[in-house]
Every structure is written in structure tokens, then in C-alpha cells.
UniProtKB/Swiss-Prot annotation:
Domain of life of the source: Archaea
Family to which this protein belongs: Belongs to the eukaryotic ribosomal protein eS31 family.
Keywords: Metal-binding, Ribonucleoprotein, Ribosomal protein, Zinc, Zinc-finger
Protein name, UniProt field: Small ribosomal subunit protein eS31
Gene Ontology biological-process annotations: translation
Keyword Transmembrane (UniProt): no
Coiled coil (residue ranges): none
Transmembrane segments: none
Entry-linked HAMAP family: Ribosomal_eS31
Gene3D superfamilies: 6.20.50.180
Zinc fingers typed C4-type, residue spans: 21-42
Assembly description: Part of the 30S ribosomal subunit.
Free-text remark on how the cofactor is bound: Binds 1 zinc ion per subunit.
Length: 55
């Protein structure tokens, strides 16, 4: 994925599509997987919360 694909312009402002890594800081994005967010540089991982269906 290229850096330009991680941003979009909305109402004349630059908006990030992905989150930055809290360990590495600005400029290092977290990759979005089906069940987690992962940093490719330091290995930081955040798991997504699973919504349980009411029965």
C-alpha cells in the first residue's frame, strides 16, 4: 500500500484513513486486519472488540 492511499481530502482538509502506532509515533501506521490492528515496525497489536449477538 502506498502512503498516498492512507490519506484522503475531505472539505479541503487532509484526513488519515488509518491510525498511527502509539509506540512508534506519527508516520507509522497500523495495518488493519480482520480481528486486529498491527504495527509492522515494532509488532504492536491491538485486538478488535467482538460484538456478541443477543440470543
Amino acid at each position: 500500500m502506498q502512503k498516498r492511499e492512507l490519506y484522503e481530502i475531505a472539505d479541503g482538509k487532509l484526513v488519515r484513513k488509518h491510525r498511527f502506532c502509539p509506540r512508534c509515533g506519527p508516520g507509522v501506521f497500523l495495518a488493519e486486519h480482520a480481528d486486529r490492528f498491527t504495527c509492522g515496525r515494532c509488532g504492536y497489536t491491538e485486538f478488535k472488540k467482538v460484538k456478541k449477538a443477543k440470543s
